[in-house]
């Protein structure tokens, strides 16, 4: 039974009437463009075929009722006429509450909803299960009540909910790709303007995500430190963000910068350039050049931004040794663990899977998790 069938059946069973709509919103993986989003730079993610699915129907009152199928059918209920505050024990419900609260501030022309939620985006793997949930909930209200909100506004609403209601800092990429993703395409997103350009993916290429399952500990504090170092760099150049600094300008005065800040700045500037070129390489079907850019990105994250760990570097080395110049591999996400992403010909997937299974655990003592994904459509009815 797929997620649509599961949520529709559960909806009818619990609420004793059929759902009128089923909405999905996907998770995502970032192919290239790491730690560029909060520097007003470029990112190149694609939506993946793991998603949050919500079967739903409008109510004729002001109550929101939610069933979390993946949490033992826990029930959440709140009124649109009372102040929406955080739930003490059901953390999942705060994503729903936050999205609804911020939707009210944007466009309050909606009533109550019954919904059943289920998803298969792996949690804690850096594949944006939370953004997928936020965008799915926003799309439910937009579709049921014909709200005049586009995908970018639904994405911004989800980001606000996560930052201000749930209390977790995030850029806009995760929600934007979940809302705007296009089947068989990646999306080159300008994080300053929120402009997005669909980039066709070469035929016969698989998106492989491998979770190192290394438990991240430093990610919060180190993320904030990197952000501060980037802001220091932008101030040095008297620019609002590193997006506005050219590599030429940087190279001319790099020796005057604090050495660590200089390394951080060099990563962001070079990564922005790589991301724009990667979009062009993908469109041309030049998997070899894409692989080189991904390798340069990983080296920059390892040596200049210093956010990889030995387990991640080991995974990258195993995949690279298996695929040679037929595709690319790099760490993806915030760093200090998490996942690597590889773009490889579909016929090489079994060899990569076997090489990783044979070598990664033997070298690190940790068992990986292996996902093969397709670039998928963004949020909407399913």
From Swiss-Prot:
The active site is at residue 174. The gene is galK. Gene3D superfamilies: 3.30.230.10, GHMP kinase, C-terminal domain. This is Galactokinase. It is an enzyme of class 2 (transferase). It is found in: Cytoplasm. Pfam families: GalKase_gal_bdg (PF10509), GHMP_kinases_C (PF08544), GHMP_kinases_N (PF00288). Mg(2+) binds at residues 130, 162. GO terms for molecular function: ATP binding; galactokinase activity; magnesium ion binding. It catalyses: alpha-D-galactose + ATP = alpha-D-galactose 1-phosphate + ADP + H(+). It comes from the Bacteria. Pathway: Carbohydrate metabolism; galactose metabolism. Keywords: ATP-binding, Carbohydrate metabolism, Cytoplasm, Galactose metabolism, Kinase, Magnesium, Metal-binding, Nucleotide-binding, Transferase. InterPro entries: Galactokinase (IPR000705), Galactokinase_bac (IPR022963), Galactokinase_CS (IPR019741), GalKase_N (IPR019539), GHMP_kinase_C_dom (IPR013750), GHMP_kinase_C_sf (IPR036554), GHMP_kinase_N_dom (IPR006204), GHMP_knse_ATP-bd_CS (IPR006203). One of its GO terms (biological process) is galactose metabolic process. ATP binds at residues 124-130. Belongs to the GHMP kinase family. GalK subfamily. GO terms for cellular component: cytosol. Substrate binds at residues 34-37, 223. Its main location: cytoplasm. Catalyzes the transfer of the gamma-phosphate of ATP to D-galactose to form alpha-D-galactose-1-phosphate (Gal-1-P). It comes from Salmonella paratyphi C (strain RKS4594). Its EC number is 2.7.1.6. Coiled coil: none annotated. The record marks 28 as: Transition state stabilizer.
